[in-house]
Amino acid sequence: MAGAKEIRTKISSVQSTQKITKAMEMVAASKMRKTQDRMSSSRPYSKAIQGVISHISKANIDYQHPFLIEREVKNVGILIISTDRGLCGGLNVNLFKTALSEIKNWKEQNVEVSLGLIGAKGIGFFQSLGLNIKAQHSGMGDTPVAEELIGIANRMFEAYKEGKIDAIYVTYNKFINTMSQKPIMEKLVPLPELDNDSLGKNSDNWEYIYEPNPQTLLDSLLVRYLESQVYQAVVENLASEQAARMVAMKAATDNAGNLINDLQLVYNKARQASITNELNEIVAGAAAI
């Protein structure tokens, strides 16, 4: 059995670690709430653009933007959004499993796959696999800036317009609630058929005058909409990261508390044994006299 002094040192070490994990839990909780607010505030913007795009595209316009046209899929682009930091449980592992499963499915259909990576963890993982990486970005911090994300997104979109990619998907961790985050893959382009519910039940009867013309407006709005979708995915993934980190740090704090209790019990037994030995020595010495 370890000595009492050694056990006290272990208890002190675990207590120090417990303070760190508790602080990280509280910081993650605060950041998660801020990210949730950012996530909620960006949704109406994306929804409003979606409604206008739907109305224009259904207004009998003789113009079809490339982002709205389905074509034979020979090359697929996947934008994978991971975290820059660890200590967030199995968040990235589950995301990578989802992405690898989809990549495998595409390759079994003889479809080439190109990746766009956001997040240091994803960059490190997929680079080690030797996959085709078109673009990458890391170092977003806790408050991602849309302008910094537009570059990597536009490189994927330009490849689509040039015919180098036939479809683009985004993979990220969708924030369900504090205890649940789900890795999902969503199609970015060609855009799935949009509805115009956000414009109201009688939106089909509304007449608009578009300046300078519907084609120019649609071109601009589609790019803005896709950029907002990428930003929304990044923010949702960030909220998932903070939630997962908060849960992981709480579990670590609780485990540290249990370990301290166990060590305290061992310490008490060691101290009791030490006192018993001392008493036995005293009794033995007295008997010898």
Swiss-Prot record:
The keyword Glycoprotein does not apply. GO terms for biological process: proton motive force-driven plasma membrane ATP synthesis. InterPro entries: ATP_synth_F1_ATPase_gsu (IPR035968), ATP_synth_F1_gsu (IPR000131), ATP_synth_F1_gsu_CS (IPR023632). One of its GO terms (molecular function) is ATP binding. Keywords: ATP synthesis, Cell inner membrane, Cell membrane, CF(1), Hydrogen ion transport, Ion transport, Membrane, Transport. Its main location: membrane. The keyword Repeat does not apply. It is found in: Cell inner membrane. It holds the Pfam family ATP-synt. It is a peripheral membrane protein. GO terms for cellular component: plasma membrane; proton-transporting ATP synthase complex. It comes from the Bacteria. PANTHER family: ATP SYNTHASE GAMMA CHAIN (PTHR11693), ATP SYNTHASE SUBUNIT GAMMA, MITOCHONDRIAL (PTHR11693:SF22). F-type ATPases have 2 components, CF(1) - the catalytic core - and CF(0) - the membrane proton channel. CF(1) has five subunits: alpha(3), beta(3), gamma(1), delta(1), epsilon(1). CF(0) has three main subunits: a, b and c. Produces ATP from ADP in the presence of a proton gradient across the membrane. The gamma chain is believed to be important in regulating ATPase activity and the flow of protons through the CF(0) complex. NCBIfam families: ATPsyn_F1gamma, PRK05621.1-1. This is ATP synthase gamma chain. The gene is atpG.
